[in-house]
A protein has these predicted regions:
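Active-site-proximal beta-strand/loop segments in catalytic clefts of secreted hydrolases
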Residues: 1, 8, 59-62, 100-101, ...
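Active-site His/acidic residue clusters
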Residues: 1-26, 65-74
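Metal-dependent active-site segment of extracytoplasmic phospho-/sulfohydrolases and closely related
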Residues: 33-72
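C-terminal cap/loop subdomain of S1 sulfatases and analogous C-terminal strand-loop tails that border
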Residues: 64-87, 106, 110-116, 120, ...
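Beta-strand elements within well-structured catalytic alpha/beta cores of enzymes
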Residues: 1, 31, 38, 55-60, ...
Length: 191
């Protein structure tokens, strides 16, 4: 969901009696729209008979862009510090949800039901390697890949191949200064 927040007319009636401000109601209708679209997608791949071979990845690209200080607002990154364009966790840590539409018994990459795994770092650079491995494809010879497959993490296991460090270089002036941050384990260096 990204600004500007224009209400999805299919769901606005669900929030008419809410005492939340208009932007929060609009945001809620957009979340309902995402939920409906995801359900439609899952129904479609099930009808086509490919649900057991379909992995859905839901990923954010950056933290919320909500105003700082509005800890309980619908656009907040709380309890994380910061927001989009900042060097803090609220600007860089985002949801990454992976799930098979229907986990087949024969699927070697099955994700355990109700399983949450958040002990290892992952980045959008890892998506390409993950899709290659899960899809049984090989990286073209000579093609350099910066990411690591998240297949083990998506199966609830730790991946010993995935380093525990991450560097973010942000050479843009987006409501903040330019910055570089380096994270290793529980530590982060910000420059």
């Amino acid at each position: 969901v990204h600004s500007p927040f224009q209400s999805d007319p299919r769901f606005i009636k669900n929030y008419e009696i809410s005492k939340k401000p208009r932007p929060a109601k609009s945001f809620a209708t957009l979340i309902a729209g995402i939920d409906k679209s995801l359900g439609d997608l899952m129904d479609h791949v099930t009808e086509k008979g490919v649900a057991e071979n379909t992995l859905i990845l839901f990923v954010g690209d950056n933290g919320s862009d909500g105003p700082l200080g509005d800890t309980y607002g619908c656009f907040s990154s709380a309890p994380l510090r910061g927001k989009k364009g900042t060097c803090y966790e609220g600007g860089m840590r985002v949801p990454f949800i992976g799930s098979w539409v229907k986990a087949g018994k024969e699927n070697p990459f099955k994700i355990a039901r109700n399983h949450l795994h958040h002990q290892q770092i992952g980045t959008v650079m890892d998506i390409y390697s993950t899709i290659l491995e899960v899809g049984g494809a090989k990286n073209p010879e000579g093609h350099v890949v910066d990411g690591f497959s998240l297949r083990k993490q998506l199966s609830g296991q730790l991946n010993p191949q995935r380093p525990d460090h991450f560097m973010c270089h942000f050479p843009h002036s987006h409501r903040s200064s330019y910055f570089t941050s380096y994270r290793k384990g529980d530590w982060k260096l910000i420059y």
